[in-house]
Amino acid sequence: MGTIYEKNKLKIKEYIGVENLFDSFKLNNAGFALMMKVDQYDEIHFTTYYKYGDFVKSSIKKCIISSLKKKQKYIELDSWNFLIIDLEGDAEDAKNLFQCITNSINQLLNDKKQKIYFSIAAGAIELSKEFYSYDRVLECLNFSLNRAEGFNGNKFYLFDMQHYIRLKRKEEILKHIYWAINHDFEGFELYYQPIIDINTKSIITLEALLRLKMKDEYIQPKEFISLLEQTHLILPVGRWVLKTAMESWKELQQLIPGLKMNVNMSFVQVNQNNSVQMIIDIIKEIDTTLL
């Protein structure tokens, strides 16, 4: 994401006159920005030589320009990236423009008996007051392009603020998880929920519950557990949980003889070939008499 953003930021800013652009869409609360990228541009260059690659690029440029309306601005960026700004249109106009451009490109290259197939990804945002800065526009636009690149064929993604917020939240949590693991699991905490025998009113079992603190808030388990499993970071964290729970259990045995401890394990952990050996190794570290 950072590559396109950093390389083209100044170029875009100088070309379109950002101050005038922002004055326009703040007043109208309308308009859109559309960034497009040819996915297989490296393959076009290296498998068909530069001459054909230049032809494809110039063809795309012609198709874009021929599809533009009067008040739409076009900028050719680096690495086969193209940007279109419209100060009056909306999301539907952006989608229709992309469809028009891709249809035009397909028709032109088919007429020329194209030698290689490629697809185009496009990310779009509706310009509104929530985009309060130039950097914000580019950040969200580039986010949309990256999302579009995850689809197949010619693909279009319209920026969704709620989707963006959710993904940024995940990124923030995952970044904190990496930090915590690399700092001796700082921020991870274990709480022990007692299970009581209703007849004797005594604690017979404890269940270990994993919690994660990030700055001044506790992250909901449903937010961070799935991230741990998806990234397989559940393996180092899970080992820490088992070891910490066993250490606590050993100490509590002195106060409550016969106390049991339940520790949940993820399928990712259980599915590891060495999961049983890992448990044995942890027990050996704590107290071999427990074996």
List each language-model region with its residue ranges.
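Catalytic core of bacterial c-di-GMP phosphodiesterases, primarily the EAL and HD-GYP domains
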Residues: 202-206, 233-291
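Cyclic nucleotide signaling catalytic output domains
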Residues: 74, 100, 121-130, 136-151, ...
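Active-site core of bacterial EAL-family cyclic-dinucleotide phosphodiesterase domains
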Residues: 4, 17-20, 169-227, 264
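Nucleotide second-messenger and two-component phosphorelay signaling modules
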Residues: 4, 20-32, 36-39, 47-51, ...
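Conserved long alpha-helical elements within nucleotide-processing catalytic cores of c-di-GMP signaling
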Residues: 2-32, 39-65, 75-79, 91-99, ...
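Catalytic core regions of nucleotide second-messenger enzymes
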Residues: 75-78, 105-121, 149, 217, ...
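Alpha-helical scaffold within the catalytic cores of cyclic-nucleotide enzymes
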Residues: 61-68, 93-111, 139-142, 241-250
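Catalytic strand-loop-helix junctions within cyclic-nucleotide turnover domains
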Residues: 85-94, 112-137, 162-166, 194-200, ...
